[in-house]
Amino acid sequence: MQLNKIKLALGFAAAATMAMPMVASAAADQEKAMSNANNWAHPRGQHDNQAYSKLTQVNKGNVKNLKAAWTFATGVNRGHEGSPLVIGNMMYVHTAFPNNVYALDLNNDQKIVWSYFPKQDPSVQAVLCCDNVNRGLGFGDGMIFLQQNDGQLVALDAKTGAKKWDVSNVDPKVGATNTNAPHVIKDKVLTGCSGAEFGVRCFMAAYNIADGSLAWKAMSTGPDSEVLIGADFNKENPLYSALSVYEDVNGGNKQGGSFKKIPTDQLQGGVADLGVKTWLKPQAVKDGWQHGGGSVWGWWPYDAKTNLVYYGTGNPSVWNPDVRPGDNKWSMTV
């Protein structure tokens, strides 16, 4: 596994090579809600993604006495991942495919205030990995954000459930899906991509919460310009940017030869476009990086002090490593 810190300026469309000022937060209501421990306004509680609650009513001394106070049946008998959101007296519940959303009034016997039922093509379930799950909802700027399994990112009015906007993030017809929870950070909503099992080239993307327009997209593989790698990338650890840990000794990069491991002290660091150059053998009619996987399905902590988002990419594609020798950057990377 390679360890690489990717710095993404959340207020801008491309990777920054210098300190950049942030725009004013459009999700001030999210920040206010998260400051109150009675709320759960982020899919993991806070931007640090630790899922830790400061509430003390339930503790190690009385947890054994907990009993169910009430239940709510979603009607979807598949894996339910991710917690509901709670903002004030409202609870927002999501389901596995077809990703229904319910807004419940906790002050009125959990009455359903509004509901949203996406119309998705059932065939998307055939390319979902690891059950038809959805990992949660996002909140900010008076909206609830849902990342549907079919790739549609949807913004719903938190009070009424009315759709404010939606945008297509991935295409299930090529094996790409979404199972992640949207993460709202300032004026952006971050989402990812799943599908490395099917040779999808995945990414992390940020959309403007005001209108759903794309702010930036960082691919998991490919040229530096598409991965959003800046000039100062891995400056302190250049060996993490080594060309390869293998040497092509018989034309394997294009013709199918043989490879041997390069001694650590002979690694060449600071090389550009490693997301292309470390895929040492083509698959079918394309170079491997063009369908190299690297799913991004969460979770993504944000550090407000440094303005950094940390995220990991998943396994390279295809599964068989014999047909994609090399480091396969930037899959399996932080």
Which residues does each predicted region cover?
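Repeat-blade elements of multi-bladed beta-propeller folds
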Residues: 37-44, 79-100, 126-152, 177-201, ...
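Beta-propeller blade signature
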Residues: 156, 161, 202-213, 327-334
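Hydrophobic/aromatic beta-strand positions that recur at structurally equivalent sites within the blades
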Residues: 58-61, 104, 156-157, 207
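Aromatic (tryptophan-biased) beta-strands that constitute blades/sheets of beta-rich domains
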Residues: 27-74, 111-126, 162-171, 213-222, ...
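Gram-negative bacterial Sec-dependent N-terminal signal peptides
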Residues: 1-25
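Beta-propeller domains
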Residues: 260-268, 272-333
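Short, solvent-exposed loop/turn and secondary-structure capping segments
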Residues: 51-53, 103-106, 115, 125-127, ...
